[in-house]
């Protein structure tokens, strides 16, 4: 049982039927990474906002979570690789995406508003509903992703004509400028030493700096299109580029977090402390961008289905439903697993694994219902 890698440049887009094989692997791995991220969060988020019980917990949080920050951008690149450039009418494209993504999102948002987590105290449904007028609910914070991806879909028909006309050099230039924008959060920290945290045109009356319009998740959209259109490398070249990029990216993600860890434990502080620690973990910062691109290139080496591919293909189809439902499952699972007295990394991995299995089985059952696409995607 193995994965066949093909080095022939003409074979880098081999698919099984109408599906691009490696993207199914990306989706399954990325959704598990997301579940693992959320299984790690209780080990540094809690108490007054930030809570770390021990130095050992801090290390596990640092080294494991730093390897997982690319999960969300991988989803963005997967969608972009498949959908760009948008063909046909933009409104038709948006209607299809909003039906496929937006309707299940609306269903599960309401379920999170009305149903409390297992073992939690009663919640205020009226407060939840009033919050939904403006944003996602704090206890369903994972739904931020859907707001973001819907925004990505909105921009896709707009940039598609440019992607169809721009030269390889022009697209590469945009990517380089975008990569520069991923350093802006770190530049703000450096600039704060001068007494001002704004950089390159930012001010109290203008949050749109010089690189604002080339920053954010749009970079992953363009990178995915560039890889599909122009990157037809051999296995050797891919490994020579991707592996060093992965290592460098991981160091940029993990080291700033590690260097901020305190000496005394337990740590119990406001949420602002965790927010400061997480600067290098943000999804559009340099390290996360590099690790995302590197992993995507490595997955792209998978060009033929192996024996386990049908299993991954099926899980890939369930991935959005797993994402929507998993917090209901994870909170209950973590409550049980954390009480078993296991080592910290075992609790993290076991919680994520059990959550993945239970969520997948539940979504599979839901998929058997009529019109299931409207509530699991």
Predicted regions span which residues?
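Alpha-helical transmembrane segments and their immediate juxtamembrane cytosolic regions
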Residues: 2-377
């Amino acid at each position: 049982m193995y994965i066949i890698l093909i080095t022939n440049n003409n074979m880098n887009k081999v698919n099984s039927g109408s599906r691009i094989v490696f993207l199914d692997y990306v989706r399954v791995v990325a959704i598990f990474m997301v579940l693992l991220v959320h299984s790690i969060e209780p080990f540094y988020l809690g108490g007054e906002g930030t809570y770390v019980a021990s130095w050992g917990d801090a290390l596990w949080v640092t080294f494991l979570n730093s390897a997982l920050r690319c999960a969300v951008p991988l989803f963005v690149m997967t969608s972009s690789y498949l959908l760009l450039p948008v063909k046909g009418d933009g409104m038709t494209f948006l209607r299809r995406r909003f039906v496929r993504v937006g309707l299940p999102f609306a269903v599960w948002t309401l379920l999170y508003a009305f149903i409390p987590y297992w073992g939690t105290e009663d919640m205020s449904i009226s407060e939840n509903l009033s919050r939904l007028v403006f944003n996602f609910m704090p206890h369903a914070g994972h739904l931020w992703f859907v707001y973001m991806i819907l925004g990505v879909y909105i921009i896709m028909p707009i940039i598609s004509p440019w992607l169809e006309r721009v030269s390889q050099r022009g697209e590469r230039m945009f990517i380089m400028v975008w990569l520069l924008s991923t350093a802006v959060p770190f530049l703000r920290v450096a600039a704060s030493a001068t007494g001002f945290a704004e950089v390159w045109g930012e001010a109290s009356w203008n949050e749109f700096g010089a690189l604002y319009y080339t920053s954010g998740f749009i970079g992953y959209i363009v990178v995915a299109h560039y890889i599909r259109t122009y990157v037809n490398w051999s296995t050797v070249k891919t490994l020579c580029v991707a592996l060093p990029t992965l290592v460098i990216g991981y160091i940029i993600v993990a080291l700033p977090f590690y260097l901020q860890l305190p000496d005394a434990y337990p740590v119990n502080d406001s949420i602002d402390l965790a927010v400061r620690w997480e600067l290098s973990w943000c999804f559009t910062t340099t390290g996360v961008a590099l690790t995302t691109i590197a992993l995507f290139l490595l997955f792209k080496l998978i060009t033929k289905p192996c024996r386990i591919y049908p299993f991954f293909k099926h899980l890939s189809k369930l991935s959005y439903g797993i994402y929507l439902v998993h917090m209901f499952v994870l909170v209950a699972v973590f409550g049980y697993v954390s009480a078993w007295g296991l080592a910290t990394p075992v609790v993290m991995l076991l919680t994520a694994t059990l959550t993945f299995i239970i969520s997948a089985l539940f979504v599979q059952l839901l998929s058997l219902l009529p019109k299931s696409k409207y509530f699991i995607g």
